[in-house]
């Protein structure tokens, strides 16, 4: 028996911000590969410890992977002419959100400090009887950031937490299963891979396995449309034929 101390984060932005501060990274120049590796390591640790993995963490992992893929795409070359076009950094949207999150994290911390300072001077009980004496400021920087997003966005969809059960399936087992299938078939749709999945948790584990194999350059995953099916193929097969 041994105890593992695992830091708990309020949300994906809290985890990302922690990794950026830990590695002393400039927000304007984030090495996505480094952050993605450490982010996926945390997700895998949660899964191995049989803990709940909120779907928002998985969505952020997919976002980081998409950014990495875009950054790895070769730049187009035009013969006979040079086109000076301002390239859009795939990290731009993420950086903007992280900067906003940082602002509200600082504001939240400032509020907490103000509450601490105020408690040193105002010790008398309030005269108004209907005020509950147990009222406290139970908020976090992640809560404030989420509230801000709700104000500026019409998207009020709630993301449910999905429990991943270690006893039934693991990332490692799904990786092996996918690699075996890719030996038999040249390409495979993600919908085919999860066809026999019995629970949402198993689908999430399968998706993490795909992300991990893409990160390790073992497979190529292509998605033509948003929320569309994902085409999976062994790394090198399609590339060699195209070249």
Swiss-Prot record:
GO CC, one annotated term: cytoplasm
Keyword annotations from UniProtKB, A to Z: Cell cycle, Cell division, Chromosome partition, Cytoplasm
Compartmental location: Cytoplasm
InterPro entries membership: ScpA, ScpA-like_C
Record's keyword annotation contains Cell cycle: yes
GO biological process, one term: DNA replication
Cleavable signal peptide: none
One matching Pfam family: SMC_ScpA
Family under the similarity heading: Belongs to the ScpA family.
Main function: Participates in chromosomal partition during cell division. May act via the formation of a condensin-like complex containing Smc and ScpB that pull DNA away from mid-cell into both cell halves.
Quaternary organization: Component of a cohesin-like complex composed of ScpA, ScpB and the Smc homodimer, in which ScpA and ScpB bind to the head domain of Smc. The presence of the three proteins is required for the association of the complex with DNA.
Protein name: Segregation and condensation protein A
Lineage: Bacteria, Bacillati, Bacillota, Clostridia, Thermoanaerobacterales
Gene name, Swiss-Prot/TrEMBL: scpA
